[in-house]
Amino acid sequence: ILEDNDLYYRTIAKVDLINKKLKTNIFHCYNKNKQEIDVFLEDYVYFSLLLISVYEVKNDKNSLKKCENLLKETWELFYDSENQLLQKNIKRTNDIFVSPIDVIDNNIPNGNGIFLLACNKLYNITADESWKSKIDLLSRSFHSCINNNYSQMFSYLKILDIYNNNITFTFHGNIEKLNKIKKELFKKYFEISTFIHRESNDEDFVVICKNKVCSNKLKSLEQVNNYLNEKSI
């Protein structure tokens, strides 16, 4: 967005540092004795979203695979089948004095919504139906919760809107040759869409989809912009 290369490289360095810190164990923070504090749902899902964002920016397949594994682990650790939502703390550490299900936004958007956002990106990229079933289940649960907590669930409304529009940009061929188009699209659409890479030795083009309605092969920035304007995306 800022076209600041120095900021970009410093950010990538910070991401690499986070990856190293969380390589063997995800934790919330250190205490004064530098001991690790147990995690919450948000620690897992925000790290997952960071990983899949790195894939979208850099075509880093290792980050994509790590995100996939981490979201699977998140589901196993936090999903409450009775409430059909992800609870705030790991299931085995439930505290009877604290409600483990928390669906409202606090200082940051709620972890359930961020899981849905990352999960939808992952489904768009991998086409793995197991992610689609989780998306459908959570979106139904969100709709029922919104009726009672509308004023405190704004991030859910935004994420459900992103999910319903489901905008994707798929880059085919030599990804490096499409970087100019990709950088321009990042400025406006990175937050509300999924960027997908399909490397091959064939022709280079972009396909834009919104809610399963897709463009033809678009080979220039002009063609991309014309399509976006024509379809009001």
Predicted region positions:
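Glycan-recognition and catalytic cores of secretory/periplasmic carbohydrate-active enzymes
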Residues: 1-233
